[in-house]
Amino acid sequence: MLRNKIDKIRLLFRKDRESYSCFYRILGFYPRNIRLYEQALLHKSTAVRSEKGRPLNNERLEFLGDAILDAIVGDIVYQHFEGKREGFLTNTRSKIVQRETLNKLAVEIGLDKLIKYSTRSSSHNSYMYGNAFEAFIGAIYLDRGYECCKQFMERRIIEPYIDLDKLSRKEVNFKSKLIEWSQKNKMEVSFELIEQSLDKENNPVFQTEVRIEGILGGSGTGYSKKESQQNAAQMTLKKIKGDPEFMASVQEAKTQNNVPAEDTTPESEMSLTAENQQIDEIISTEEISV
C-alpha cells in the first residue's frame, strides 16, 4: 500500500504518467518496469526491432506467461477444490487457460484496446488477445514475481469474471473444437483407437490417437472411448497452438496429399502446371488460426 503511494508521487514527475495510469487501472498497482508491459502488448506483425536489430514483440513473454499461468491457475484451482481428483483439477484449469477464455478476459480488462499490431498484415489471428494476456502475465511475473502475479489473477481476474464452481461443471467438447478447426482450415483429421486394455482393477482403458493429415497430433487415454478421444483432442489442440514445427509438418503433409498424379501428355502437363500454380496460391495465402 505504501509502495503504491510512493509510486504515485513519483508518477507526478514522469512524462509517461498516462501510460502508468493506464496500466494501474488494469493491474491495481504501478509497474516498476513499464517496458515489459508495453512489449507484452506488441504483436509481431508490427515488425518492430530493438537497437541491436532483433525482433521486438510479445512472443517470448507469451511463452513465459503460458507456463506461469498454468502454475498459478493450477495453484488456485487446487486450493479452491479441496479433495478433488487430479483429472477434475486438470479439466477445470484447462477451461480457464484455454484460448477462448483468455480472449474474453483480455477484452474484459481492456487489453484489446492497447495491443499494437499492423493492420496491413494478415498474420494476426483471432487468438491475438489471448496471446497478449499470456504475455501480460509474463510481464507481471518478471516485474513483480509469482505472488503478485497470483494476487492479480485472484483479485482482478478470477473474483470479478470467473465463477470457479460454475465453470467446473461446464463441459468442454475438445473433439468438437478440433473438428471445427479442421473444417475451417480444410485439414483431414482422424481419431484412431490404438489400444484397449484393463487396469489393475479390471476396468477397461482405451487409448486414442489423433492424426492431422496423417501426422500424429496427440494421444489420450480414458475409461471410455469418448474420454480417450476428448483427451487426445485436447492434447492435439495444445500442440496446434504451441508447436510451430508440428504445424509445419502438417502443412507439408497436406501439400503432398493434394498433389495430383503425374501425366506425361503435353495437355496434361499444361493442366498440371496451372493446377500447381493454383495450389501454390492457396498455400501462400492460407492462414492457419490456432
UniProtKB/Swiss-Prot annotation:
A cellular component term, taken from the record's GO annotations: cytoplasm
InterPro entries: dsRBD_dom, RNase_III, RNase_III_dom, RNase_III_sf
SUPFAM superfamilies linked: dsRNA-binding domain-like, RNase III domain-like
One term of GO molecular function: double-stranded RNA binding
Subunit structure: Homodimer.
Segments for region (Disordered): 254-290
Protein name (Swiss-Prot/TrEMBL): Ribonuclease 3
Pfam families: dsrm (PF00035), Ribonucleas_3_3 (PF14622)
